[in-house]
């Protein structure tokens, strides 16, 4: 079997072979190439020890030299080169206490997680596949190398990785491997939130986000996302729904594109339903207040999983407004854009459609038509360049200073009042009209009697008369 290696990978392997060492491309790059995919990076394994690797290449980085890994830099691209090794006993479900370098490739491949990741290749020896990884690729199976309980005991994150690979590749998890995950799921507590987040995002943004169901079934989500377990266990007895909250969530994730923000939003859009559910006298469920409560819960969850502030902000905003249904008028849509932000509206429409498509058929067309009408007005507003952000207001602080106004609280209040007025009446958004309103405000303020001073302190009252 012939694999086309990149030139830099060939160079590294050839240089090591010239010095009498074995070297192979290994792991995910071999797997992806055999699947007809383009590997994101190429890793190399070798019988040469780290110091030898460092001596053979002019630019190297000690990325994990204690565990035998050196990054070789060629034309500003890094290639991890790792010495064959045998791992000692694991004490923290992630790192071995000791590492022993070996000259035996198969011994090195034994320590790897799954058979599909335990294949090596070079142009001289061809494909080295000691654990039938190629067979598992053909069978579309995720299977541990050796004894699953041992592999997961070495690094508990491998359990979540098993489901992630199943999601990315559309594979199933082999039964003994699956059972070992269920047996050892609680060990995921030993893994950092950052590492869990990385695997979760890869799963969510894969072609099969429905594998979150497997995460739940195997007991993994109860460790890092117990809120999802409650969602899976909360029915929705209402004509608008045909699934539990969790199943609705899974179907909704499938209805949006493979985008990080959208998939996270759909995962969490109904996260508060289990805590907001009520049942009326007819036995029907209601979830009043779940968007606002859900936004707060989403914030807590995303912080717990160490997401960045921008992701938290966007996801929580979309969760907060996913079920917002203002009357579809230009005024209401302008105000919605102002609250939500132009940059978030396309995502909001995607979220609303996905939410609807994951519900029952009850009034589905009516709901979709509402979203279409909402979006149509939104696009018309953008086309006409109507003011929906304060920065689009036809005047600014410099213009007010030129009118004799001092900087400070009053200026901010006046600009806000003008902005509110323009949201209602977009035709007012030209410099002359707005300056005339400001002038009117100033004249009115000067001419009013003392007993009305308190009323006149509101710029909103003055501008909007």
List the predicted regions and their residue ranges:
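Catalytic cores of the polymerase beta-like nucleotidyltransferase superfamily
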Residues: 1-449, 454
């Amino acid at each position: 079997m012939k694999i086309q290696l990149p030139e830099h990978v060939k160079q590294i392997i050839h240089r090591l072979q010239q010095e009498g060492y074995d070297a192979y491309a290994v792991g995910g790059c071999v797997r992806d190439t055999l699947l007809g995919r383009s590997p994101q990076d190429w890793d190399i394994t070798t019988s040469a020890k780290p110091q030898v690797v460092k001596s053979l290449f002019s630019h190297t980085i000690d990325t994990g030299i204690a565990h035998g890994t050196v990054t070789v830099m060629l034309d500003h691209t890094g290639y991890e080169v790792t010495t064959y090794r045998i791992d000692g006993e694991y004490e923290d479900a992630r790192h071995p206490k000791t590492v022993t370098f070996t000259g035996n490739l198969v011994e090195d491949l034994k320590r790897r997680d799954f058979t599909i990741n335990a294949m090596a290749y070079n142009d001289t020896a061809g494909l080295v596949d000691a654990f039938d990884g190629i067979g598992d690729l053909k069978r579309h199976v995720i299977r541990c190398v050796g004894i699953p309980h041992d592999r997961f005991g070495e690094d508990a994150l491998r359990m979540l990785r098993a489901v992630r690979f199943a999601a990315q590749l559309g594979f199933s998890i082999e039964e003994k491997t699956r059972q070992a995950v269920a047996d050892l799921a609680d060990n995921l507590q030993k893994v950092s939130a950052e590492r869990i987040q990385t695997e979760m995002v890869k799963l969510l943004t894969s072609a099969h986000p429905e594998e979150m169901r497997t995460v739940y079934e195997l007991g993994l989500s109860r460790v890092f996302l117990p809120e999802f377990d409650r969602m899976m266990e909360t029915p929705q007895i209402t004509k608008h729904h045909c699934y539990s909250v969790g199943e609705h969530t899974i179907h909704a994730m499938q209805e949006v594109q493979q985008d990080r923000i959208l998939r996270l939003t759909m995962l969490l859009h109904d996260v508060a339903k289990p805590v907001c559910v009520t049942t009326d006298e007819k036995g029907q469920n209601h979830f009043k207040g779940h968007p606002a409560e859900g936004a707060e819960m989403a914030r807590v969850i995303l912080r717990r999983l160490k997401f960045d502030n921008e992701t938290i902000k966007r996801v929580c905003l979309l969760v907060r407004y996913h079920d917002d249904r203002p009357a579809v008028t230009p005024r209401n849509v302008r105000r919605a854009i102002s609250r939500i932000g132009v940059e978030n509206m396309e995502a909001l429409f995607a979220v609303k459609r996905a939410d609807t498509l994951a519900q029952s058929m009850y009034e589905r067309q009516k709901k979709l038509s509402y979203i279409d009408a909402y979006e149509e007005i939104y696009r018309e507003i953008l086309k006409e360049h109507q003011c929906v952000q304060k920065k689009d207001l036809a005047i600014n602080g410099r213009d007010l200073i030129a009118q004799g106004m001092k900087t400070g609280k009053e200026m901010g209040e006046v600009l806000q009042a003008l902005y509110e007025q323009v949201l209602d009446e977009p035709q007012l958004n030209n410099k002359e009209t707005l300056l005339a309103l400001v002038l009117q405000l100033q004249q009115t303020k000067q001419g009013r009697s003392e007993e009305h001073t308190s009323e006149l302190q509101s710029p909103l009252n003055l501008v909007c008369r």
